[in-house]
């Protein structure tokens, strides 16, 4: 499966900013396609071993997220966002602190966006597709 690189940064609920960094991984939508895809009305659950879980819509898997200006935190329009399952940050494998072995990242070709940190699931160990007709783990 081909790797994808992009720039992504996020902010936490307490206002800590993680400046955009170079992220490398595989497109989550491509992973979903490997098991018959994600229906338009389906969801993707991303789970970490500590019990943290995020549920993403079909549109989010395709890159539809709110984006914010890194200086003003005002919402700004975006163009080419991708959701990836990241395994490398700034040219190095993820550390435990950064979410080793795998982490969800929201990336773009430009570093002008921040996204909300709760979407950047660390330590991913399971993804579950929930479609109306079937479930894939």
List where the protein language model places each region.
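N-terminal intrinsically disordered, low-complexity segments enriched in P/E/S/T
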Residues: 1-137
């Amino acid at each position: 499966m081909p790797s994808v690189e992009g720039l992504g940064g996020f902010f936490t609920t307490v206002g800590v900013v993680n400046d955009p960094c170079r992220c490398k991984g595989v497109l989550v939508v491509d992973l979903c396609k490997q098991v018959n895809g994600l229906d338009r009305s389906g969801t993707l659950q991303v789970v970490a071993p500590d019990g943290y879980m995020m549920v993403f819509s079909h549109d989010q898997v395709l890159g539809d997220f709110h984006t914010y200006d890194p200086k003003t935190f005002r919402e700004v329009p975006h163009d080419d966002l991708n959701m990836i399952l990241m395994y490398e940050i700034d040219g190095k494998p993820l550390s435990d602190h950064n979410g080793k072995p795998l982490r969800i990242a929201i990336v773009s070709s430009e570093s002008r966006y921040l996204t909300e940190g709760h979407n950047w699931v660390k330590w991913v160990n399971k993804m579950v597709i929930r479609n109306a007709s079937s479930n894939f783990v």
